[in-house]
């Protein structure tokens, strides 16, 4: 049953009667294509004065024009960043203008936008696990989930920085 679910989620289950099942490689390839088209993944972290970075995963709309803009405008405060990371330990689905209250994960996007709430996989969908990453410094941050953009609040500088992972040699830039 688990295999069927994976095949359905990867859009390879839709086949005509009598057709061969796809290979594992076919399923993985299709899943990766879907994953890349589905979301602009990102991570958000806080850098302490010694350079240590604590970060969590974010799933949708990770572009600087959206997540970057929201972080700079609404989360330029270390206590808010810490709260975002604490609640985001199981991941952040969508970033809003504020942390907001617990709400139905499947609430229509327009309603979430109107309320300005951030949607968390743990708080709002009940997912467990702790995917918080602690890195010695910025250079040690790992992108294990296909994150395209990394965002860090520097406690020392009191500024947001970001990096586009599609350009590995690119330096961190101020938002």
Give residue spans per PLM region:
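Catalytic phosphate/metal-binding cores of nucleic-acid and nucleotide-processing enzymes, i.e., regions
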Residues: 46, 55, 63-66, 80-81
